[in-house]
Design a protein with these regions (language model features):
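Extracytoplasmic gate region of multi-pass secondary transporters
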Residues: 178-227, 231
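A late C-terminal transmembrane helix in Major Facilitator Superfamily
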Residues: 297-331
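Cytoplasmic helix-loop-helix junction between adjacent transmembrane helices
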Residues: 69-104
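Helix-breaking motifs and short loop linkers at transmembrane-helix boundaries and internal kinks
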Residues: 6, 38, 59-64, 241, ...
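Helix-loop-helix hairpin linking two adjacent transmembrane segments in secondary transporters
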Residues: 100-151
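C-terminal transmembrane helical hairpin of 12-TM major facilitator-type secondary transporters
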Residues: 240-287
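Conserved MFS/SLC helix-loop-helix module at the cytosolic interface between two early adjacent transmembrane helices
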Residues: 25-64
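Helix-to-loop junctions at the C-terminal end of transmembrane segments
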Residues: 26-38, 229-241, 326
Length: 408
C-alpha cells in the first residue's frame, strides 16, 4: 500500500487522524440526525457511507485521494456508533449491549484476516478494501430491508422513546448537566487504557525479551480476550447490574497491571495481557447501557454522543503521547502508563456515581435533568437578549456619531 501510493510511512497516521476527527464531529452531530432520520435510516445511511469510502480506498490512485474518502469513513463510523449504542441502551437489555460490543472483537480479528486472504490470493490491499465494501454493501441492503422493524420497535416502547420526539438539547446545555463532563472523561480514560494496551503490548513483550511473533500473537490474544470477555459478561449481566460489572472489570485490570510489574516468570506477561483484555471487556458496554438510567432517556442520545467523542479523543491523543514518553525513557514504563489510565478511570467512575446519585438521584434523573436544561435554556435566552441589546446600542451609537459628524 505504501509503495503503491508513493507515500511516507507517517502518512498512515494522518489518515487515521482524519477518520478520527470525522468520527468525533459526526458523533456530536448524531443527536440532531437521529431526530431527522430515526435510528434505522441513519444506520443505513452511515453503513452506505462507509461502504462508499471503502470502495474509494480500493480505487484510490494517490494518498490524497484516500484522505478524501477518509472523511465519509469517519462520518459514517461516528453516526453508527452513537445511534446503535443509543438504541441498545434504551430498547435492549444489558446482555444484548455486551453481545453487540462483542461483535467489535469479531471485526477486529476478521479485518487482518481479510487482508491476509486478499494478499494470499494475489488481490493485494485494494482487493481487501473492495471485499470490505462488498460486505458493508450487503449490510446496508439488509438495513434497508429491515427499516420497518426499527420503526416498529421504537414505537413499541412508547412514542416518547422515538428519536424524533427527543428534545433538541444543545451540546452546551448538555454539558451543564451534573456528571456529563465526568462521563466524557470516563470514556476518555477507558479508551486510552484499551487502545494503549492493544497498540503497545506487543512492543512491550519484545522489549522484555520475547520474539516478535509472540508480541504479534499477544495483540491478537488481547482482542480475542475482549471479545470472549464481552460474550461472557453478557451472561453475567443477567444477574448483576451494569455498575457491578464495571467495577469488576476495573478490578481485573488493576490485578493485571499489578502482576505486570511483579518479578514473576516471563511467561506470566502474556497471561497478564489476556487479563487486561478480559477486564476491559465489560466496562465499555456496561457504561453505555447505564446511560439512560443515569441521565434519562431524553438526554441519552446527546450523552452517548459526548461519551463517544471522549472515547475517540482518548484513542487519538494518549497512544502517541505514550509513544513520546517511551521514546525519551523506555517502553518498559508501559505498565506505569496503564496504572495511570486505570487509576484515572476508577476515579472518574466513582466520582460519576457519587455526583449522579447526589445531584440527580437516579430515581428522578429525568425530571431533575429537564429542570437543569430549562434553567440553561433560560440563561441562553437571557444571554441572547443581552447580545441583541448590546448590538442595538452599538448601532445607535454609530448613528449618533454619524449624525454629529454630518452636523459639523
Amino acid at each position: 500500500m505504501q509503495l503503491d501510493l508513493h507515500a511516507p510511512l507517517s502518512a498512515a497516521g494522518l489518515l487515521s487522524i482524519i477518520v478520527s476527527v470525522g468520527t468525533i464531529v459526526s458523533s456530536l452531530l448524531t443527536p440532531k440526525l437521529l431526530r431527522l432520520f430515526g435510528t434505522g435510516k441513519l444506520v443505513f445511511i452511515s453503513v452506505a457511507l462507509t461502504a462508499v469510502a471503502s470502495v474509494g480506498y480500493g480505487f484510490s490512485a494517490t494518498f490524497w485521494m484516500m484522505c478524501l474518502f477518509a472523511i465519509p469513513m469517519g462520518i459514517g463510523a461516528g453516526a453508527i456508533d452513537v445511534s446503535l449504542n443509543n438504541f441498545a441502551a434504551i430498547h435492549l437489555e444489558s446482555k444484548h449491549t455486551s453481545w453487540l460490543h462483542a461483535s467489535w472483537g469479531i471485526g477486529a480479528c476478521l479485518g487482518p484476516a481479510l487482508f491476509a486472504l486478499s494478499a494470499f490470493l494475489g488481490f493485494g490491499w485494494r482487493g481487501a478494501y473492495e471485499l470490505v465494501a462488498l460486505l458493508l454493501g450487503v449490510i446496508a441492503v439488509m438495513m434497508l430491508a429491515s427499516l420497518p422493524i426499527w420503526k416498529r420497535r421504537e414505537h413499541l416502547d412508547g412514542p416518547q422513546q422515538s428519536p424524533a420526539s427527543a428534545p433538541d438539547i444543545s451540546l452546551r446545555a448538555a454539558l451543564r448537566v451534573p456528571g456529563m463532563k465526568l462521563s466524557f472523561w470516563t470514556f476518555f480514560f477507558y479508551s486510552s487504557l484499551e487502545i494503549s494496551t492493544s497498540l503497545w503490548c506487543g512492543t512491550y513483550l519484545v522489549a522484555r525479551g520475547f520474539e516478535p511473533e509472540v508480541g504479534a500473537l499477544a495483540v491478537s490474544l488481547m482482542f480475542a480476550s475482549v471479545m470472549v470477555g464481552r460474550i461472557l459478561s453478557g451472561f453475567f449481566a443477567i444477574r448483576f447490574t451494569d455498575m457491578r460489572l464495571v467495577h469488576a472489570g476495573i478490578a481485573i485490570v488493576v490485578v493485571g497491571c499489578m502482576v505486570l510489574v511483579l518479578p514473576l516468570p516471563l511467561w506470566v506477561t502474556p497471561v497478564c495481557i489476556c487479563l487486561l483484555g478480559l477486564g476491559c471487556a465489560p466496562v465499555y458496554p456496561s457504561l453505555i447501557h447505564a446511560t439512560p438510567a443515569r441521565f434519562g432517556e431524553e438526554l441519552s442520545g446527546r450523552a452517548i454522543s459526548i461519551q463517544m467523542a471522549g472515547s475517540y479523543l482518548g484513542s487519538i491523543i494518549m497512544p502517541p503521547a505514550f509513544g513520546f514518553v517511551a521514546g525519551h525513557f523506555s517502553v518498559i514504563v508501559w505498565p506505569v502508563a496503564l496504572a495511570i489510565f486505570v487509576g484515572s478511570l476508577l476515579f472518574c467512575v466513582c466520582l460519576l456515581d457519587y455526583v449522579t446519585r447526589k445531584k440527580l438521584n437516579n430515581a428522578f434523573a429525568a425530571e431533575r435533568i429537564m429542570d437543569v436544561l430549562q434553567q440553561v435554556k433560560a440563561m441562553e435566552e437571557q444571554r441572547k437578549r443581552a447580545r441583541r441589546e448590546r448590538r442595538r446600542l452599538r448601532r445607535k451609537q454609530k448613528r449618533q456619531k454619524l449624525l454629529k459628524s454630518r452636523g459639523r
